[in-house]
A protein has these predicted regions:
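Glycine-rich, basic loop-to-helix element that forms the pyrophosphate-binding segment
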Residues: 17-35
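Membrane-embedded multi-pass helical conduit in multi-pass membrane proteins
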Residues: 192-257
């Protein structure tokens, strides 16, 4: 932990407690309990973040969603990396826009500021028996309790995350995400998930659905990551229904990830 000023403590779970073991949420609890500031800034230990802004004004937020961007360390990203960057751009744009409209459906513990006392009050809502998902379950808990959720879409506070370099690691992460889905109860999250799943299953049955879906999702991608090519986005759109189906089946078969 590191104090960056009198109101915020940075909390970074290290490798070894940030893996798939069930100790992760307990470790977060210990770190956040030990903090003495009003807020904690949660981030992953492998993100790249260089704050370029002035003193951060939290304006009474209980949860502040901060921007993330995926970027490869390679000068010429692989196909897998390019697909992940496009997907992540769409996810991030949806995260930002839904939060701005007061109906947040996603957030990421890779770059998140939370009021310490509120996090501790919500700890039992984080499903400690499930290794991952503390960020999404926290979002659900805060929405259910009517707490103040805000978003700051400012590149000065943007953290950089890296794409997976192997298909195996990529699908393991997506299966973990899918495996948590049955635990979600928030109506906005469920509605969004149902629309995404339904549209992609419909595309498997009728490929012409792509003509409706692609312009919507391409807008999300380009707004967040303008350098993603049309062909990368189109390939992602074609493969996405198969990828979602595989992730869901794998995630449900391996519950408890």
């Amino acid at each position: 932990m590191e104090d960056i000023h009198e109101h915020i403590t940075v909390v970074v779970p290290r490798r070894g407690i940030n893996d798939e073991g069930k100790a992760k949420k307990h470790a977060l609890y210990c770190l956040i309990s030990a903090a003495e500031t009003e807020y904690v800034w949660m981030m992953d230990d492998d993100v790249v973040l260089e704050v370029k802004g002035e003193r951060l004004e939290l304006k009474g937020a209980d949860l502040l969603i901060l921007p993330l961007r995926m970027a490869s360390e390679n000068e010429r990203p692989s196909l897998l990396e390019r697909l992940q960057i496009a997907e992540y751009a769409a996810i991030q744009q949806l995260t930002i826009e839904s939060a701005q409209r007061g109906k947040a459906v996603m957030c990421s513990g890779a770059n998140l500021i939370v009021r310490r006392s509120r996090w501790l009050e919500s700890y039992q809502d984080l499903h400690p028996e499930i290794p991952s998902g503390d960020d999404m379950f926290l979002l659900e808990s805060f929405k259910r309790r009517g707490l103040q959720i805000m978003v700051l879409d400012d590149s000065r506070y943007e953290a950089i995350v890296r794409p997976h370099t192997s298909w195996r690691a990529f699908f393991r992460q997506r299966m973990r995400w899918a495996g948590k889905a049955p635990k979600y109860t928030d109506k906005d999250i469920l509605r969004c998930g149902t629309i995404v799943l339904g549209a992609n299953l419909l595309q498997l049955i009728c490929p012409l659905v792509l003509l409706v879906k692609f312009p919507i999702e391409y807008r999300l991608i380009k707004k967040r990551e303008p350098f993603v090519s049309l062909w990368t986005a189109l390939l992602l759109e074609i493969l996405y229904p198969f990828y979602i189906l595989l992730s869901i089946v794998g995630g449900l078969l391996r519950r408890g990830w």
